[in-house]
Regions:
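Anion-binding (especially nucleotide phosphate/pyrophosphate-binding) glycine-rich loop
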Residues: 1-91
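Phosphate/pyrophosphate- and phosphate-bearing ligand-binding catalytic cores of soluble enzymes
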Residues: 94-168
Length: 168
């Protein structure tokens, strides 16, 4: 349980919850904004939830990475966000944004704020739509493909793809 400094609320951000959409080949994973991004990616790989394995090297919390639309090796967070639940400080209420409403751009989103500033929306929880499977997204980054010794466009097992990104 973490105390939310702006709201005077206690927010339980311990872990994530999943909703398996096996009929569609996807899984919705709901994660608290204060969870560690690297831990989420590690869990996704272990659970065989594909779509964020090439983002393993991004640092920070889930909320921070989503607000900055973290990107690496041809993947970006916006590719796997389903929705973002926030606290709207202007209306003093919770508000959920569908991915299309998040205004994702290169390393930015509706939730990004400049250093030292307060934004209107505090990210509370993010729901990701990941693929249920063992293969990575196609490797689009030439340097990563060369490091792995595979052609651009190849798909890899999730763990080796994550390990290559982390330099293991």
């Amino acid at each position: 349980m973490d105390d939310h400094p702006r709201l005077g609320l206690t927010v339980d951000a311990s872990g994530c919850d999943e909703d398996n959409l096996c009929w569609s080949g996807g899984v919705l994973v709901m994660v608290g904004a204060d969870e560690d991004w690297g831990g989420l990616v590690a869990r996704a790989v272990a659970e065989e939830w594909a779509g964020m394995e090439l983002l393993a090297g991004l640092g920070g919390t889930v909320g921070e990475v989503v607000a900055g639309n973290g990107a690496a090796f041809g993947q970006q967070v916006a590719d796997v966000v389903w929705s973002v639940r926030t606290w709207d400080s202007a209306t003093a209420s919770k508000r959920t944004f569908a991915m299309a409403e998040c205004n994702f751009g290169q390393e930015t989103s509706r939730f990004a704020v400049a250093d030292g500033e307060r934004g209107r929306y505090d990210v509370l929880e993010v729901t990701f739509l990941l693929r249920d499977g063992t293969l990575s997204a196609p490797v689009r980054d030439e340097a990563l493909a060369a490091r792995l010794g595979v052609p651009v466009g190849s798909r890899l097992e999730l763990a080796p793809a994550r390990d290559a990104v982390l330099g293991a």
